[in-house]
Amino acid sequence: MINTVIDSEHTELQDVCLDPFLDLENEIDKLRCSKNAVILAHYYQSPEIQDLADFVGDSLDLSKKAAETNADMIAFCGVRFMGECAKILNPRKTVVIPDKEAGCSLEDSCPPEEFAAFRSKYPEHTVVTYINCSAEVKAQSDIIVTSSNAASIINRLPKDEKILFAPDHHLGAYITKKTGRDMVLWPGTCIVHEQFNERELVKLIVRYPGAKIAAHPECPEAILKHADHIGSTRSILEYVTSYDAHTFIIATEQHIIHQMNKLAPHKTIIPAPGADGTCDCANCPYMAKNSIEKLYLAMANEVPRIEIPEDIRTRALKPLQRMLDLSPNAASQNRNAA
């Protein structure tokens, strides 16, 4: 097995105790200028990181920004597969992530060797993979999709084309229901969306009878069947900010609520609960590994740095580029407008 490499030389720098009087925001701005760097952040990052970023968006938004940037360095505040996407699209640019351990349960659920064995059972199927997977799995794929564009891209494939979809089983089931396509599904799930609890959600609906429910399609069907709106994080954000309602229950990682509060401060936003009735399950532990301190160190020292073997990168580029070519214009949040 050839692994995607994260250059870990000097990664002990992540454990350095910084001067408590250091103005990290100012220092990051200096590095942004001196290194011609762009900071990309996912909606699931902490509010502090979102507010520092040049662009905030979902996976599709940020993939497009990574493909378009003229920066020499991309500091990707998300999880590892997102940094890999940036490197696949920009092999000559330096791509750093704040924490090398910021993985993804969906990526972990789909080891490249096991996926290769699985897809070998379906040689006549077009392999469609959700972007939440490793570069090695992307390299085995025919096309990449995100939750923003999965249904529209699959609808563009010939009706008689057989499809294998991985790694998110819940997203695959939702797309199957929405498009009517009979797909072979890999059994992966997201640890955040998997934990939302129907019983506790119904209690919340009873408590807030006028609330609208917005859910990410990575949620189980037991949650989705209660939703007034199902979509990607950006789609959920647009729904909350534009729909004429005052109260919303949000079934996705709760840091998206930061953007909702900025864009619609007059609305009441309630995170969907887990089995214990609290909203603690709505925090991604992998996204939470990143911090402003780690971002500063990553930009200053250019580690952890994403490096991908060229044969894997070139094979992964083809399905990723195909996705971008088939996707409408995305609209990530510009730092100056957020």
Protein language model features and the residues they cover:
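Active-site loop-to-helix "anion-binding N-cap" substructures in soluble metabolic enzymes
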Residues: 1-250, 257, 261-272, 276-338
